[in-house]
Amino acid sequence: GDHGRMYRGLAPEMVPAMYTLCSRASLILPNTTDAALLLGDPMPGVTGEAELHTAQTQAQRLTRICPRVLITGVAAGRGIACVGADRATGESLVRTPMVPKSFHGTGDIFGAVLVGRLLQGNVLPAAAQAAAVFVADCLKATPDEADERLGVWLESVLPRLMHNPE
């Protein structure tokens, strides 16, 4: 889901199936809506530090399902955060400046960069920071008048990712 509701076309029966799938993963990347759905919590509607605190609590609770959790898209003051919890090592937090744009596919880009950095040997907080910065750079490179349904303009930003592998 996103923005406090399930994606159109998905039935509520999908939530228990996603829970089962997540229990078999070593890392999950729910956004705030997905985290609420998986835990049976109310949909996110708060902003700022209240949302940050809720996400920290949810991340810890989600480690009962999966050993490593990174909740994305958490409002944190004037920024946006990824709130992580690791069953073995504890909690991590990554904050980046808020880019006031919303485009389809940014979560997919975040996940792709994160996994790439993890495969390069980065620890989760460093991989999450690199992914968050890359997505923010993509958002900044996308004109305000661009169609949000078509995603961000990442092509001009890709060289930064390729020439800065760490």
Model-derived regions: residue spans:
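Short, small-residue alpha-helix embedded
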Residues: 36, 101-124
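Short pre-catalytic strand/loop immediately N-terminal to key active-site residues, enriched for Gly-Thr
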Residues: 91-105
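Charged C-terminal helix
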Residues: 125-166
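Phosphate-handling active-site elements
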Residues: 91-92, 117-131
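Glycine-rich beta-alpha junction loops
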Residues: 34, 73-77, 97-100, 132-135
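N-terminal glycine-rich phosphate/adenylate-binding segment common to multiple enzyme folds
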Residues: 1-2
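Conserved phosphate/ATP/ADP-binding segment of small-molecule kinases
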Residues: 6-91, 125
